[in-house]
Amino acid sequence: MFGPGRFARTAYRVRETTPPDLGLSFVARVGPLLVGANAMTPIFIGETPAHLLGPLIVEPVFRSRGIGEALVNVSLEAARAAGGRLVVLVGDAPYYARMGFRPAGPGRIALPGPVDPARVLACELVEGALEGVAGKLRGA
């Protein structure tokens, strides 16, 4: 996930130019071990402020224990508490659906590189936040 191929990934192109919001990014520990982490990067979609969630990573031996879901949920709650309205990501729809993400819709969000439109997901932190949102995704 963090190897040289990451530079070709579309979402990483945005993250290379914009630092994450450390107040919305978290780590998971089991005892002294760092077992997971995520990041939230401030972005714009057209002129609409939002956040890009990811990467989300959990050490392989600690997967399927709810750690990734907990990291996502704490980031979403922190973003909501900070006044955020919309979070997007590029990821697996079945996994992220249980955390409130749904497909953003084809052609709505233009990323700076190739991406499967079915993997562009959005979570409205405020009901209706995705309505009327369209345009190029770029770092804030």
Question: For each of these PLM feature ranges, what is it?
Answer:
Residues 1-39:
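Active-site rim helix/loop that mediates acceptor-substrate recognition in acyltransferases
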Residues 31-32, 61-62, 124-129:
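Short loop segments at secondary-structure junctions
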Residues 43-53, 63:
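A conserved beta-turn-beta hairpin within the catalytic core of GNAT-like acetyltransferases
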Residues 78:
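Short alpha-helical functional segments enriched in proximate histidine and acidic residues
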Residues 81-85, 90-116:
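Conserved active-site alpha-helix within GNAT-family acetyltransferase domains
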Residues 110-140:
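C-terminal "cap" of GNAT-fold acetyltransferases
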